[in-house]
């Protein structure tokens, strides 16, 4: 199969996908209500789409094409409110977060869809362990070559995205000591990691052709890269975010991506190289493990510094581009929380420290998602 042509899109437009938990309201464990939720959601006129995911206790929602983080928030608000109405009818709840804190993977059931069944056959128990929940952000690119350039520039900021969105400290009832344990499940897949260092679409097509000839991949969907091109949309897709506990944070993260993209396009601040990836895996691990307390190694200089400091410096540096994109408020939110060392993983741990019961933590997280005070 040849690679699809890179379609035109308006530069810096956004699209956001959120994978969400469906839980019962008895003990707040995962509940197999995806089919019922999809049926109820289909009756409501909404932007974007609502689709099944790998197992039947999760769904994915997505916005349409948006021009700003505030437009993302507006669409997510409509979708969230419809989700809450539908869930209330079923006596269940919808929750954010990158992992469910105490679900048991072996109890999950693969959603009855051919691709999911094929993946289950291929990956075995990994498929059920893939009951994890991420946010994906698409950003429009001027052309195919510009998309690859933006992809590799964004790769320097993967640790920032991970730490700001981290919301998966608990797995099967245990504190993992990671802020983002979700990504450990992604890393188990053979085609995860980072995209190859090619900066022209012609070279990327050649790479894709080689991979398809091996029989290892059939389409771009087979790559579980941290960032991958989406030629059918004319975007790149950033895939390392945990699903936040609130749609406000999800929208703010998309605004951060857009502001970075605006900086890249306006100033062409650096040319990516293979050497950027010498510290890529280390930086990614640090962000997953320690979140806002991580160490960041600057790929250009080799300087070691607190990741939190680099996040603050980055937000300050792109502030004028955030003004142009209307993202100043969103970046102020992220900056203030980063300065305080706050992310959703810390919120979850604070709730567990206070409550000593993960079911109660999940209940309070459900309240946060629906916009009510926890």
Swiss-Prot record:
<keyword id="KW-0067">ATP-binding</keyword>
<dbReference type="InterPro" id="IPR014746">
    <property type="entry name" value="Gln_synth/guanido_kin_cat_dom"/>
</dbReference>
<keyword id="KW-0436">Ligase</keyword>
<keyword id="KW-0547">Nucleotide-binding</keyword>
<dbReference type="Pfam" id="PF04107">
    <property type="entry name" value="GCS2"/>
</dbReference>
<protein>
    <recommendedName>
        <fullName>Putative glutamate--cysteine ligase 2</fullName>
        <ecNumber>6.3.2.2</ecNumber>
    </recommendedName>
</protein>
<dbReference type="GO" id="GO:0004357">
    <property type="term" value="F:glutamate-cysteine ligase activity"/>
</dbReference>
<dbReference type="InterPro" id="IPR050141">
    <property type="entry name" value="GCL_type2/YbdK_subfam"/>
</dbReference>
<dbReference type="GO" id="GO:0005524">
    <property type="term" value="F:ATP binding"/>
</dbReference>
<comment type="similarity">
    <text>Belongs to the glutamate--cysteine ligase type 2 family. YbdK subfamily.</text>
</comment>
<dbReference type="InterPro" id="IPR011793">
    <property type="entry name" value="YbdK"/>
</dbReference>
<dbReference type="GO" id="GO:0042398">
    <property type="term" value="P:modified amino acid biosynthetic process"/>
</dbReference>
<dbReference type="InterPro" id="IPR006336">
    <property type="entry name" value="GCS2"/>
</dbReference>
<comment type="function">
    <text>ATP-dependent carboxylate-amine ligase which exhibits weak glutamate--cysteine ligase activity.</text>
</comment>
């Amino acid at each position: 199969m040849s690679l699809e042509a890179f379609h035109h899109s308006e530069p810096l437009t956004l699209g956001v996908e959120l994978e969400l938990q469906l839980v019962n309201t008895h003990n707040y464990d995962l509940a197999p209500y995806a089919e019922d939720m999809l049926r109820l959601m289909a009756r409501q006129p909404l932007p974007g789409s609502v689709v099944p995911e790998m197992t039947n206790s999760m769904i994915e929602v997505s916005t349409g094409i948006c021009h700003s983080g505030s437009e993302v928030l507006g669409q997510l608000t409509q979708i969230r409110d419809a989700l809450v109405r539908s869930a209330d009818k079923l006596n269940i709840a919808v929750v954010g977060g990158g992992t469910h804190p105490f679900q048991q993977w072996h109890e999950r059931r693969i959603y009855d869809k051919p691709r999911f069944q094929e993946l289950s056959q291929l990956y075995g128990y990994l498929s059920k362990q893939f009951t994890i929940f991420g946010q994906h952000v698409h950003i429009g690119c001027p052309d195919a070559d510009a998309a690859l350039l933006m992809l590799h520039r964004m790769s320097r900021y993967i640790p920032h995205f991970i730490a700001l969105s981290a919301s998966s400290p608990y797995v099967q009832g245990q504190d993992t000591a990671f802020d983002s344990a979700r990504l450990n499940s992604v890393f188990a897949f053979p085609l995860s990691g980072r995209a190859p260092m090619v900066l022209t679409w012609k070279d990327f097509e050649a790479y894709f052709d080689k991979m398809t000839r091996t029989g290892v991949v059939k389409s771009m969907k087979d790559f579980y890269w941290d960032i991958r091109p989406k030629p059918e949309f004319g975007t790149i897709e950033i895939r390392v975010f945990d699903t936040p506990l609130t749609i406000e944070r999800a929208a703010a993260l998309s605004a951060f991506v857009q502001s970075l993209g605006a900086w890249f396009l306006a100033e062409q601040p650096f040319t990516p190289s293979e050497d950027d990836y010498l510290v890529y895996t280390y930086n990614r691990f640090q962000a997953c493990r320690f979140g806002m307390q991580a160490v960041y190694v600057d790929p250009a200089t080799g300087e070691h510094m607190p990741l939190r400091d680099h996040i603050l410096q980055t937000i300050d540096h792109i502030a004028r581009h955030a003004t142009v994109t209307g993202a100043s408020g969103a970046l102020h939110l992220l900056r203030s929380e980063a300065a305080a060392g706050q992310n959703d993983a810390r919120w979850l741990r604070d709730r567990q420290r206070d409550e000593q019961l993960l079911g109660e933590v999940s209940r309070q997280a459900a309240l946060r998602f629906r916009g009510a005070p926890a």
